[in-house]
């Protein structure tokens, strides 16, 4: 029998990982991601861990464990996983790279266009001053966001030192900061000593000082990419600046003082669409089958299968339809409703949204639909 410990927030977990789909005896133990601890591993001795970004995969979790052979993260980001350590231990790690790239890009576009609806027409064909969208980080999400911006006729100022120069990777970070109308962050969280260009506190007092006070800042990557202390100081000096945060430096706790200064704030749900979450589960399921199925350890007598197509209902949301009817934006995604839910969760006595309440908002989130782009 294969034993799996899985984050209970993984979409359609039991539709994918069961004895019928795998044709093999299997035990799936689901729990909150923050409860996947060394003690839990000691108790259940799992062969497989299926996680999301709240579970830290490192020596603290795994040093005393000898049972885990496969770790799948149903997320784009990997900064919660010490990949060097995992490799050293001979474990296989996979993530769901790109699974929610359209979901996050659509979240960013929703934020921009709900706050600045005039940008629908601020393009190269209708304006002599088209919107300049600055994108820092041009991986799966950043490059997808650029496609939406270019489709609206906006100008993209992109910066990614790890990508080759291109139509969208076309600016220095200084130019992005100084000349963008909106800046959207799409970088992993890396620390000094672990990267040539660490992103921890990339947006600090110096970076904020280079941005015009009218520049909107959006962060959907990792909270600590932005220094919240410096951001709060900047917002006190420049109250007109619009800032949208989906991630927070001290997540899952969110300061009420900071929240009060933000234009929009949501509980780390930018990628939370039905399509994005299902795609993440499908991707780690496929990788699991490759590891344990006919191409791998021959434990499972099955091949990869596309369950996602069977689980998705019809999708009425199309990007081109929204472009033709901008007034329907809130019907496609009402970002302000998610903002209200987070603000309503502030514990006045603590002066913050508590971690338990933040996690509950994520766990109970009604998944929105991803718009069809092409």
Curated annotation (Swiss-Prot):
The keyword Oxidoreductase applies. This is Erythronate-4-phosphate dehydrogenase. Catalyzes the oxidation of erythronate-4-phosphate to 3-hydroxy-2-oxo-4-phosphonooxybutanoate. It is found in: Cytoplasm. The keyword Cytoplasm applies. It is an enzyme of class 1 (oxidoreductase). One of its GO terms (biological process) is pyridoxine biosynthetic process. The active site is at residues 222, 251, 268. Pfam families: 2-Hacid_dh, 2-Hacid_dh_C, DUF3410. GO terms for molecular function: 4-phosphoerythronate dehydrogenase activity; NAD binding; protein dimerization activity. Pathway: Cofactor biosynthesis; pyridoxine 5'-phosphate biosynthesis; pyridoxine 5'-phosphate from D-erythrose 4-phosphate: step 2/5. It comes from Psychrobacter sp. (strain PRwf-1). Its EC number is 1.1.1.290. Its main location: cytoplasm. Belongs to the D-isomer specific 2-hydroxyacid dehydrogenase family. PdxB subfamily. It catalyses: 4-phospho-D-erythronate + NAD(+) = (R)-3-hydroxy-2-oxo-4-phosphooxybutanoate + NADH + H(+). The gene is pdxB. GO terms for cellular component: cytoplasm. Substrate binds at residues 53, 75, 272. It comes from the Bacteria. Keywords: Cytoplasm, NAD, Oxidoreductase, Pyridoxine biosynthesis. Homodimer. InterPro entries: D-isomer_2-hydroxyacid_DH, D-isomer_2_OHA_DH_cat_dom, D-isomer_DH_CS1, D-isomer_DH_NAD-bd, Erythronate-4-P_DHase, Erythronate-4-P_DHase_dimer, NAD(P)-bd_dom_sf, PdxB_dimer_sf.
């Amino acid at each position: 029998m294969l034993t799996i410990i899985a984050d209970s927030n993984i979409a359609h977990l039991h539709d994918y990982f069961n004895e019928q789909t795998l044709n093999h005896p299997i035990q799936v133990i689901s729990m909150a991601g923050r409860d996947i601890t060394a003690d839990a591993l000691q108790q259940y001795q799992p062969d497989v861990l299926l996680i999301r970004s709240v579970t830290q995969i490192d020596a603290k979790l795994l040093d005393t464990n000898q049972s885990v052979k496969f770790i799948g993260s149903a997320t784009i980001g990997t900064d919660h996983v010490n990949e060097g350590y995992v490799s050293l231990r001979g474990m296989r790690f996979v993530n769901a790279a790109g699974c929610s790239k359209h979901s996050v890009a659509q979240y960013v576009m929703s934020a921009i266009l709900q706050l600045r609806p005039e940008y629908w027409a601020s393009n190269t064909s209708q304006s002599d001053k088209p919107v300049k969208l600055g994108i820092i980080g041009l991986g799966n999400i950043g490059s997808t966001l650029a496609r939406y911006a270019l489709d609206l006729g906006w100008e993209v100022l992109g910066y990614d030192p790890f990508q080759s120069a291109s139509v969208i990777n076309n600016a220095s970070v200084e130019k992005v900061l100084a000349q963008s109308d909106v800046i959207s962050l799409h970088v992993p969280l890396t620390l000094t000593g672990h990267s040539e260009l660490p992103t921890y506190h990339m947006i600090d007092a110096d970076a904020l000082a280079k941005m015009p006070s009218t520049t909107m800042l959006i962060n959907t990557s990792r909270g600590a990419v932005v220094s919240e202390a410096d951001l709060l100081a900047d917002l006190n000096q420049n109250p007109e600046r619009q800032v949208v945060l989906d991630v927070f430096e001290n997540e899952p706790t969110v300061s009420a003082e900071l929240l009060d200064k933000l234009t929009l704030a949501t509980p780390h749900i930018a990628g939370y669409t039905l399509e994005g979450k299902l795609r993440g589960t499908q991707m780690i399921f496929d990788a699991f089958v490759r590891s344990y199925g006919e191409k791998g350890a021959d434990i499972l007598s099955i091949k990869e299968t596309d369950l996602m197509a069977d689980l998705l209902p019809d999708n009425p949301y199309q990007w081109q339809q929204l472009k033709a009817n901008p007034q329907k934006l809130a019907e496609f995604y009402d970002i302000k409703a998610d903002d209200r839910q987070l603000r309503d969760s502030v514990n006045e006595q603590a002066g913050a949204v508590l971690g338990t309440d933040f996690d509950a908002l994520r766990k109970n989130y009604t998944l929105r639909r991803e718009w069809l782009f092409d």
